Amino acid sequence: MQITILGNSGPYPRAGGACSGYLLEDERFKILLDCGNGVLSRLLGKIKSLNDLDAIILSHLHFDHISDIMVMKYAIGINQEKGMTNKSIPLYAPNDPQDIYDMLQFKNAFKLNELNSKSILTFGDMKISFELMSHPITTYAVIVEKKGKKFVYTSDTKYCDVLIEMSKEAELLLCECNLLEKDKTEDAYHLSAREVGEVAALADVNKLLLTHIWPEYDLNEVLNEVKIMFSGDVEIATELETFEI
């Protein structure tokens, strides 16, 4: 398996960058995880056409994770009308808020499927499961397992015990890292860099990638704060870079 970082900022992109979006691939399947601002253009530079996508998974329905879906649906729906494709891409997402979920569809661009914490998806020998995170709207972490290896994408969340359990001995943990500890407040529904390091250390992950970083931060400062708690392999999830799992 491999994961390509299409965007790593939140809740808005750096100049020339993109918000959350990740292309998960193995020998047979291509699955898009989240589709925030700037992701569609990046995705089209990595695949031949949207027909190549086997599925899309939206971790939650905040716009920095879904805004380009609202454009992608036109690309697919209009191309269907023109006879350029007859494919409707399976799209999995929580239905909260319902009005945003209802906006995802355009014509027959997607086969919409509601996600919940008991959902299990299989693509060949890839098994994908979900854990409920702690965020203002329903948000799911994505856990991908294949041939004894585990990849975990946290999506957005504040610190919670399930983070450690679901990430135990992951080959790769792609973790949101939206705050520096000095900026953390009681009502923040995101992880500080220090907390990310603690999760990675307690879960004994093989490699840690930092994403969903506030675009005004100095990336070295973020990385150095993580390293206070985690002495393992850690780096920024650099946009357009591909990481093996």
Listing of model-derived features with the role each one plays in the protein:
Residues 38-88:
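Active-site metal-binding motif and surrounding structural segment of the metallo-beta-lactamase
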Residues 27, 81-82, 147-149, 202-209:
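Short, surface-exposed connector motifs at secondary-structure boundaries
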Residues 68-76, 100-103, 218-226:
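Metal-dependent catalytic neighborhoods of phosphoester/phosphodiester hydrolases
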Residues 113-169:
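Catalytic core of the metallo-beta-lactamase
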Residues 1-46, 140-155, 172:
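Conserved beta-strand hairpin/beta-sheet module of binuclear metal-dependent hydrolase folds
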Residues 32-36, 54-60, 64, 94, ...:
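Active-site neighborhood of phospho(di)ester-bond hydrolases with catalytic His/Asp-centered motifs
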Residues 4, 92, 111-116, 129-131, ...:
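General small-molecule cofactor/ligand-binding pocket signal
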Residues 159-242:
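Cap/insert and terminal regions of metallo-dependent hydrolase folds
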